[in-house]
Amino acid sequence: MYKKVIYLLVVLLAAAGSISAQGDVKKNMNPVTTRWFVSGGVNGSAALNGSAVNELNAKIAGGLWFNKIIGARVTVNAGNNWLKGGYNAFTMGAGVDLLANLMKHYADEDSRFRLSGVVGIHFGYYSFPDDFPNQKHVGTVAGNFGLQAAWKLTEKLEFYVEPGVKLMPKYWETDGEDDPFTAGTLTLGVTYNF
């Protein structure tokens, strides 16, 4: 009789452990885990076509990871733009980006490192000095592509580096050319996850 009771207790404990483990697995496999975040950083860009155009901005963003793979963010930025010839312009803008977690299937979810692809559209505004009377206020639309590498500092705080490329119509007329403007970009910042 005692053997039967001991066997029954062992089986019940094993079953309870198995059920608990299955609950943990199901919780971790849930593909719909939304997560809000805000971020801030410094963004710089330099023309890739040799036109000596550089830009430095403060950038803030807010977004949502819809699940463990796809997210979106809204960005705003403001800063300064330097053109060849010693001219500069105030710049500000806003954009929308789609984020894709490239590490979801290749790394542990609790990994301290994350790599995401970024694709988006950005609307910009440039306020030029009086030397450019025909284009004192210029609006632009740009496409941007990049990769974001993020490292967890704490459970909620991440540091990220985001290199990328920005493509847009040329927005200034100092040399009469009509080239598309292509710039390499780099953003360094921090993200707070809610």
Model-predicted segments: where are they?
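Bacterial N-terminal signal peptides that target proteins for export
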Residues: 1-7
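Outer-membrane beta-barrel biogenesis signature
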Residues: 5, 19-39, 102-115, 194
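Bacterial N-terminal signal peptides
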Residues: 9-16
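Short glycine/proline- and aromatic-enriched beta-strand/turn motifs that initiate or cap beta-hairpins
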Residues: 21-65, 71, 126
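Hydrophobic, lipid-facing positions within transmembrane beta-strands of outer-membrane proteins
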Residues: 36-38, 56-60, 92-96, 115, ...
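Solvent-exposed loop/turn segments connecting transmembrane beta-strands
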Residues: 47-56, 83-89, 174-180
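Gram-negative (and chloroplast) outer-membrane scaffold detector with strong preference
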Residues: 64-142, 151-155, 191-192
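Detector for outer-membrane/organellar transmembrane beta-barrel domains
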Residues: 93-96, 162-169, 175-193
